[in-house]
Design a protein with these regions (language model features):
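C-terminal soluble interaction/assembly domains
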Residues: 236-238, 243, 248-298
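Bacterial N-terminal signal peptides
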Residues: 5-19
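Helix-loop module immediately N-terminal to the HCX5R catalytic loop
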Residues: 76-104, 220-251
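Thiolate-centered catalytic microenvironments shared by cysteine-dependent enzyme domains
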Residues: 86-177, 181, 201-202, 260-276, ...
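Mature N-terminal segment immediately following signal peptide/propeptide cleavage
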Residues: 28-56, 65-71, 93
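Active-site neighborhoods of enzymes that stabilize oxyanions during catalysis
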Residues: 28, 32-33, 40, 75-77, ...
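Solvent-exposed loop/turn segments at secondary-structure junctions
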Residues: 54-57, 72-76, 112-116, 141-143, ...
């Protein structure tokens, strides 16, 4: 059994009470902001803008006032699986150093083309109980610079924040949870990988071919348009409907290592679905010889 560092950083009582005691999740009115909105709020005292990606890229130019974050800074060290959430105490310290407080309005933007690194940070903050305070900049840095908005290479001094996380128990799931819900009505297992990995035509290095039995394929890349912005809500909703996901259903998503799937997690939350991330994803499921796999496009939407 794989032990999740994030979940083992708490006592049992905290894990059972966290979701009800604090936190909660954002919604379509708070999870996404435009370049216009960010431009008009850049000088807000409680705003924390985080550029997600390599620090070398951040140093070449970023949104004024932004701070830099790489995914390696919010990934567990010394564990068998890649990109697992670390204990919440470590996450709290990382975001405190970035100036985050419990009353901060946090805006994340991607420094590069794809949004999956940014949605991974969103999920992390959501798991810490800060989801209601956090939004993605639609289109990321490319949208900002494409509109000729100001950028800087200045690395500002950051005043540490005062943040206390309250871990949410309704976000991260493990293989046991997925296995026990494979045929449960109203629970949809969603494979966020590209179709060739889902079908088994392409095999990840050292892993088994195929997908979790009964999973549907909603590739993470299908959620965004050619400019890297999320597609229209009506189009996103239509894709979820075509995959057999109904209003009131729960979405449990996975990918290779728990990064691409956060795009589906984010989109599902945006559309109002209850969502979970199987953090171990295919790297975990595939390594478990006691768990079944399915090959082919049997459940293709």
């Amino acid at each position: 059994m794989v032990i999740r560092p994030f979940l083992t950083g708490f006592g049992l009582a905290v894990a059972l009470q966290a979701a009800a005691a604090c936190g909660g999740h954002g919604d379509r009115g708070s999870m996404l902001v435009t370049t216009e909105w960010l431009s008009s709020h850049l000088k807000d005292d409680n705003l924390v803008v985080i550029g997600v990606g390599p620090q070398t890229v951040f140093a070449q130019g970023h949104i004024p006032g932004a701070v830099s974050l790489e995914l390696s800074e919010i990934s567990a060290k010394g564990v068998a699986l890649t990109l697992e959430l670390p204990p919440v105490a470590e996450l709290t310290e990382t975001f405190r150093k970035l100036g985050v407080s419990n009353n901060s309005r946090i805006v994340l933007y991607t420094l590069q083309a794809s949004i999956q690194s940014t949605t991974r940070v969103f999920l992390t903050l959501d798991a810490m109980g800060l989801g209601k305070n956090t939004a993605l900049l639609d289109g990321g840095y490319a949208a900002w610079t494409g509109e000729g908005r100001p950028v800087t290479t200045e690395i500002r001094a950051v005043k540490p924040g005062a943040v206390e996380a309250c871990a949410q128990s309704d976000i991260i799931v493990d293989a046991g949870y997925v296995s026990s819900n494979l045929k449960k009505p109203g629970v949809n297992i969603v494979d966020a990988r590209l179709p060739d990995f889902y079908s088994g035509r392409q095999i990840p290095n050292g892993q088994r071919a195929g997908h979790v039995p009964g999973a549907v394929n909603l590739p993470f890349s299908s959620m965004v348009d050619e400019k890297g912005k999320l597609k229209r809500e009506a189009d996103l909703s239509a894709m979820f409907t075509a995959a057999g996901i109904k209003t009131g259903d729960r979405v449990v998503t996975y990918c290779h290592i728990g990064q691409q799937a956060t795009v589906i997690y984010f989109t599902a939350r945006l559309l109002g679905f209850d969502a979970r991330l199987y953090d171990g994803s295919w790297q975990d499921w595939s390594a478990r010889q006691d768990l079944p796999v399915e090959v082919g496009n049997i459940h293709k939407p």
